[in-house]
Swiss-Prot record:
Gene field: rplE
Transmembrane domains' residue ranges: none
Listed GO MF terms: rRNA binding; structural constituent of ribosome; tRNA binding
GO CC term, one of those recorded: ribosome
Subunit structure: Part of the 50S ribosomal subunit; part of the 5S rRNA/L5/L18/L25 subcomplex. Contacts the 5S rRNA and the P site tRNA. Forms a bridge to the 30S subunit in the 70S ribosome.
Keywords: Ribonucleoprotein, Ribosomal protein, RNA-binding, rRNA-binding, tRNA-binding
Name under which the protein is recorded: Large ribosomal subunit protein uL5
Family from the record: Belongs to the universal ribosomal protein uL5 family.
Gene3D superfamilies: 3.30.1440.10
Lineage of the organism: Bacteria, Pseudomonadati, Chlorobiota, Chlorobiia, Chlorobiales
One GO process term, biological-process aspect: translation
Source organism (scientific name): Chlorobium phaeovibrioides (strain DSM 265 / 1930)
Function: This is one of the proteins that bind and probably mediate the attachment of the 5S RNA into the large ribosomal subunit, where it forms part of the central protuberance. In the 70S ribosome it contacts protein S13 of the 30S subunit (bridge B1b), connecting the 2 subunits; this bridge is implicated in subunit movement. Contacts the P site tRNA; the 5S rRNA and some of its associated proteins might help stabilize positioning of ribosome-bound tRNAs.
Length: 198
């Protein structure tokens, strides 16, 4: 009997799906299929990745700002950020080619759904004077980007330890071919867009 308990404890538990991932498979797929009349389930749009980018233009004169941005982005996403470097020199901005100007994290699979859930459930409601996210930031190919002005909306960031308020861009990349499909997909997943006045 004790041996069976040890064997059961030794086998790792099956990974659990994120809440929104389960919601997508159980409800969103059928809602999108009904709305857009897809012939095949594989044609139903899905969230492919989320990219979070923080630009730190002053990193050349103040390298500590880039270190802070890296640390905060790591706390928010749970992944190590990549340092973004300038592709060309721009003398007006005192920018040299290859100079660090920001950082980025790309989330996929379970981490992506967990971040999306935290973003719409916890972070977005903490935005000051929030009345909904704009629905005008689609790129024409089914991807949506939103700018966040303050990193302190994320609960992982301690407001007392923040040296300065820093914004970021969050891009939601979908497999949708049109903005309408992407809008419905993100709405079904819980994205709080502005209500349209009739």
């Amino acid at each position: 009997m004790a041996q069976k308990k040890e064997e059961a404890a030794a086998t790792p538990a099956a990974p659990t799906a994120a809440r929104l991932q389960t919601l997508y498979h159980e409800k969103v797929v059928s809602a999108l299929t009904e709305r857009f009349k897809y012939d095949n389930v594989m044609n139903v749009p899905k969230l492919k990745k989320i990219s979070i980018n923080i630009g730190v233009g002053e990193a050349a004169s103040e390298p500590k700002l880039l270190e802070t941005a890296l640390q905060e982005l790591s706390q928010i996403t749970g992944q190590k950020p990549q340092i973004r470097k300038s592709k060309k020199a721009i003398s007006n901005f005192k920018l040299r080619e290859g100079q660090a100007i920001g950082c980025r994290v790309t989330l996929r699979r379970k981490a992506m759904y967990e971040f999306f859930d935290r973003f719409v459930s916890i972070a977005v409601p903490r935005i000051r004077d929030f009345r909904g996210l704009p629905d005008t930031s689609f790129d024409g190919r089914g991807n949506y980007t939103v700018g966040v002005r303050e990193q302190i909306i994320f609960p992982e960031i301690d407001i007392d330890k923040v040296p300065r308020i820093q914004g970021m861009d969050i891009s939601f990349v979908t497999s949708a071919t049109t903005d309408e499909e992407a809008f419905v997909l993100l709405t079904e997943l819980g994205m709080p867009f502005k209500k349209k006045n009739n």
